[in-house]
Amino acid sequence: MSNANPFFSQSLAERDASVRGAILKELERQQSQVELIASENIVSRAVLDAQGSVLTNKYAEGYPGKRYYGGCEFADEVEALAIERVKRLFNAGHANVQPHSGAQANGAVMLALAKPGDTVLGMSLDAGGHLTHGAKPALSGKWFNALQYGVSRDTMLLDYDQVEALAQQHKPSLIIAGFSAYPRKLDFARFRAIADSVGAKLMVDMAHIAGVIAAGRHANPVEHAHVVTSTTHKTLRGPRGGFVLTNDEEIAKKINSAVFPGLQGGPLMHVIAGKAVAFGEALTDDFKTYIDHVLANAQALGDVLKAGGVDLVTGGTDNHLLLVDLRPKGLKGAQVEQALERAGITCNKNGIPFDPEKPTITSGIRLGTPAGTTRGFGAAEFREVGRLILEVFEALRTNPEGDHATEQRVRREIFALCERFPIY
């Protein structure tokens, strides 16, 4: 159907060259740089198409079949697809796919299962936890009596004995298991036993490892936790958003009320469409193969870095991320993040357990393999990336402000590598 109204026919390039130009520059950046930020990934064209669909026009407050607006027949269809697919993916009885983010999903659980002033026990930020798990600057750290567990100073592994001791002493109403920067598997069964021993609810935030769990390469927290939250991006390779799972019908009712009307109004139906597509992709055998490559690539990258004299927190990784301790190289996280970006490699500065540096400086960086694996990198490519990272490290040791010649040479090699594995 032709439409003479330019409002509906003009492209972004025709209507807003400034925004279009910024998007094109971001596309070029993604095409020409190696993305090692562990929380980032690259979505499929199908997910992009779903997010750019006319569903962005639709208000759909409420839930499928129980909306507060008319005209929701097809919004219901899309949300029902997302719900059924994510339930199959994680073998869950109930799912809420409306949270706009992982933080919103976590907030909904706390609203549903805890009262202001209740004691909440989560992993400390400096040990690898997330802001929303009770860190002081976050809402969870302000509204609740938030206590933090950490890792062993000797092994850098999660200290389950400390979790148990804190739980026995303080009797939290909610225990949170999950992380933002922890490279090892979690023992969900032990967390549940600790929670049961003090009458607490167990929430697992699986945001970073949701894809690994979906592929069956990590224990499924749905089998142990009262409630599970996640983002839809990261290893799950979907749009930016969140969801909540539970097998408890009463908790499911509380979660639904906490998401809407408790925290949010209308759901973002175009994002939920993208979630449905990504969940469908994650149900395939191809996705399992992808996750196997993500894990193998993390091992390959870690092996090269360790061979080059770099310390990895806990000595390695069981998942998609590596936490690099830069102190043996005499380097800082912020310094390395900037140098690597100049060289065409993006990562993030990250505190390490018991870090003496400020969060804006840090003694470490966090690296991840999901995005590079999505574009087709295998172990050989990640070994090459590791070698180039080491070259930047060594140049920084000689020239702490940055070695332009080395960074530009590495950037050319990175660009050539990316050209072999194009995106979009």
UniProtKB/Swiss-Prot annotation:
Primary localization: cytoplasm
Sites bearing N6-(pyridoxal phosphate)lysine, chain numbering: K234
Catalytic activity of the protein: (6R)-5,10-methylene-5,6,7,8-tetrahydrofolate + glycine + H2O = (6S)-5,6,7,8-tetrahydrofolate + L-serine
Keywords carried by this UniProt record: Amino-acid biosynthesis, Cytoplasm, One-carbon metabolism, Pyridoxal phosphate, Transferase
KW Transferase (keyword) present: yes
Location within or outside the cell: Cytoplasm
UniProt cross-references to NCBIfam families, sorted A to Z: PRK00011.1
Protein name: Serine hydroxymethyltransferase 2
Species assigned in the record: Burkholderia mallei (strain ATCC 23344)
Taxonomic lineage of the native organism: Bacteria, Pseudomonadati, Pseudomonadota, Betaproteobacteria, Burkholderiales
Gene from which this protein is expressed: glyA2
